[in-house]
Amino acid sequence: MAAAALNGLKMAATSQAYLESMPVNDTRKLLSDLCRHFYGLGWVSGTGGSITIKVHDESIPKPQQLIVMSPSGVQKERMVPEDMYVLSPSGCFLSSPSPKPYPNKPPKCSDCAPLFMKAYLMRNAGAVIHSHGMESCIVTMIDPLSKEFRITHMEMIKGIQGHGYYDELVVPIIENTAHERELTDALAEAIEAYPKTTAVLVRNHGIYIWGDSWIHAKTQAECYHYLFDAAIKLYQLGLDWSTPDHGPIKKYGGKTNMSVKAGTVNSNHETEPSRRCIVLDIEGTTTPISFVTDVLFPFARNNVSRHLAATYETDETQDDIKLLRTQVQSDLEQGIVGAVPIPPDDAGKEEVIAALVANVEAMIKADRKITALKQLQGHIWRTGFQNNELEGVVFEDVPEALQKWHASGIKVYIYSSGSRLAQRLLFGYTNYGDLRKYLCGFFDTTVGNKRETKSYVEITESVGVDKPSEILFVTDVYQEAVAAKAAGLEVIISIRPGNGPLPDNHGFKTITSFSDI
């Protein structure tokens, strides 16, 4: 009965009569009014930028509400209600504007449509704004290597959902592409990686901002642009907007902390390498190996059945199952010990889950570094961290070192066999609080095996250095050290309690604490 009622609701909401109803027409008019207003602010000039709003109707659940969207490549200040597109909740066109005479171009829906849909689907947004405001573009250029914009202790931060005056506002930055639609995957990854954010900056381009309603989205957009403008002005004054006191930007080697740190002189008066980036391993480097083997792995193993049963119908878990099926089929063909066939979907949920659990337990027992396992483990751990069943552990010297490197303008990345999601969780929920603010990015085995030189070549090409020697890689595994050195990276081996032995005469510098770096 409930399904039938929902289907009836969907049909009624997409009927021609409803498309001509007051809620839809009011939303069309509101959108055209906002286009003119935002044009005056410089957010949608030169036909750039776009806006979309869901048709608010108390009788229709938000996920089923229709979507009104502005067109692309048009003069936003001249928009009228009839120029707007109306889309279904899934993004199908229900109503399109009529062509206008020359010199107007044929109507075309916003190129931002796929990105707007991500905000609707992933954040249940009520409205999304894409601005080309000058301040949202320039603020991404101040530090070309930064993956985030950060600001704190500014009154207007209070206008951003979930933030107060004393909080640090963090906005992810993704790289621009030649075509708007090519940003879709990067935007989705940023939304997933930053669950608290209500905006994503696009370098040298602009910003996407969403809210529960058009008022909420508009209010936040005004606050974001104010904060970006403030950061730019503070930077021009030589003041640091990212610190509570907004004091002078610190300088290292004649450069500000917005730049990279120059080579330093050690206690023997020898010039050490100029490090622009530090790439850190996790197990045995930032975190005790025992935490992974004694806490994380058992948690995943003990909760895999519960997790699969509770989330079986979700798209995320179905993707996990698809990856596991592919991996298990390969394992069976290669005769991998512990691999058992997974029944087809029509065999029943319980049978499929039982086979999946058997395979996952065998993979964990063998400590296999494979994407299918790591991805599922990450999703299980996410639930544990969010429910306070898990807390990440790092060595006591790690937070201070990360803070020091961050202040020095050195970019710090993580490279681990664990999934990027698992890495973000570990550093986001540590015994020292959220340390992700000191990290610029995460690499996992999708970039390559950690014992292969080409993986470190790929990382070198991804972090924006001029040469591999500007990267310091810290690991506890000799084979990884050899591979990184072969790629031209500077390498240090971490000696921590519980780490495995190293070969005699291995030839690498070693440390027992990050304070030694």
UniProtKB/Swiss-Prot annotation:
<comment type="pathway">
    <text>Amino-acid biosynthesis; L-methionine biosynthesis via salvage pathway; L-methionine from S-methyl-5-thio-alpha-D-ribose 1-phosphate: step 3/6.</text>
</comment>
<dbReference type="Pfam" id="PF00596">
    <property type="entry name" value="Aldolase_II"/>
</dbReference>
<dbReference type="GO" id="GO:0000287">
    <property type="term" value="F:magnesium ion binding"/>
</dbReference>
<dbReference type="InterPro" id="IPR001303">
    <property type="entry name" value="Aldolase_II/adducin_N"/>
</dbReference>
<dbReference type="InterPro" id="IPR023943">
    <property type="entry name" value="Enolase-ppase_E1"/>
</dbReference>
<keyword id="KW-0456">Lyase</keyword>
<dbReference type="InterPro" id="IPR036412">
    <property type="entry name" value="HAD-like_sf"/>
</dbReference>
<comment type="pathway">
    <text>Amino-acid biosynthesis; L-methionine biosynthesis via salvage pathway; L-methionine from S-methyl-5-thio-alpha-D-ribose 1-phosphate: step 2/6.</text>
</comment>
<keyword id="KW-0460">Magnesium</keyword>
<feature type="binding site">
    <location>
        <position position="283"/>
    </location>
    <ligand>
        <name>Mg(2+)</name>
    </ligand>
</feature>
<dbReference type="GO" id="GO:0005737">
    <property type="term" value="C:cytoplasm"/>
</dbReference>
<dbReference type="InterPro" id="IPR023214">
    <property type="entry name" value="HAD_sf"/>
</dbReference>
<dbReference type="Pfam" id="PF00702">
    <property type="entry name" value="Hydrolase"/>
</dbReference>
<keyword id="KW-0486">Methionine biosynthesis</keyword>
<dbReference type="InterPro" id="IPR006439">
    <property type="entry name" value="HAD-SF_hydro_IA"/>
</dbReference>
<feature type="binding site">
    <location>
        <position position="281"/>
    </location>
    <ligand>
        <name>Mg(2+)</name>
    </ligand>
</feature>
<feature type="binding site">
    <location>
        <position position="112"/>
    </location>
    <ligand>
        <name>substrate 1</name>
    </ligand>
</feature>
<feature type="binding site">
    <location>
        <begin position="416"/>
        <end position="417"/>
    </location>
    <ligand>
        <name>substrate 2</name>
    </ligand>
</feature>
<dbReference type="InterPro" id="IPR036409">
    <property type="entry name" value="Aldolase_II/adducin_N_sf"/>
</dbReference>
<protein>
    <recommendedName>
        <fullName>Probable bifunctional methylthioribulose-1-phosphate dehydratase/enolase-phosphatase E1 1</fullName>
        <ecNumber>4.2.1.109</ecNumber>
        <ecNumber>3.1.3.77</ecNumber>
    </recommendedName>
</protein>
<feature type="binding site">
    <location>
        <position position="132"/>
    </location>
    <ligand>
        <name>Zn(2+)</name>
    </ligand>
</feature>
<feature type="region of interest" description="Methylthioribulose-1-phosphate dehydratase">
    <location>
        <begin position="1"/>
        <end position="240"/>
    </location>
</feature>
<keyword id="KW-0862">Zinc</keyword>
<keyword id="KW-0511">Multifunctional enzyme</keyword>
<feature type="binding site">
    <location>
        <position position="476"/>
    </location>
    <ligand>
        <name>Mg(2+)</name>
    </ligand>
</feature>
<dbReference type="InterPro" id="IPR017714">
    <property type="entry name" value="MethylthioRu-1-P_deHdtase_MtnB"/>
</dbReference>
<dbReference type="GO" id="GO:0008270">
    <property type="term" value="F:zinc ion binding"/>
</dbReference>
<feature type="binding site">
    <location>
        <position position="130"/>
    </location>
    <ligand>
        <name>Zn(2+)</name>
    </ligand>
</feature>
<feature type="binding site">
    <location>
        <position position="450"/>
    </location>
    <ligand>
        <name>substrate 2</name>
    </ligand>
</feature>
<dbReference type="GO" id="GO:0043874">
    <property type="term" value="F:acireductone synthase activity"/>
</dbReference>
<dbReference type="InterPro" id="IPR027511">
    <property type="entry name" value="ENOPH1_eukaryotes"/>
</dbReference>
<feature type="active site" description="Proton donor/acceptor; for methylthioribulose-1-phosphate dehydratase activity">
    <location>
        <position position="155"/>
    </location>
</feature>
<feature type="region of interest" description="Enolase-phosphatase E1">
    <location>
        <begin position="278"/>
        <end position="517"/>
    </location>
</feature>
<keyword id="KW-0479">Metal-binding</keyword>
<comment type="similarity">
    <text>In the C-terminal section; belongs to the HAD-like hydrolase superfamily. MasA/MtnC family.</text>
</comment>
<dbReference type="InterPro" id="IPR027514">
    <property type="entry name" value="Salvage_MtnB_euk"/>
</dbReference>
<keyword id="KW-0378">Hydrolase</keyword>
<keyword id="KW-0028">Amino-acid biosynthesis</keyword>
<dbReference type="InterPro" id="IPR027505">
    <property type="entry name" value="MtnB_viridiplantae"/>
</dbReference>
<feature type="binding site">
    <location>
        <position position="205"/>
    </location>
    <ligand>
        <name>Zn(2+)</name>
    </ligand>
</feature>
<dbReference type="GO" id="GO:0046570">
    <property type="term" value="F:methylthioribulose 1-phosphate dehydratase activity"/>
</dbReference>
<comment type="similarity">
    <text>In the N-terminal section; belongs to the aldolase class II family. MtnB subfamily.</text>
</comment>
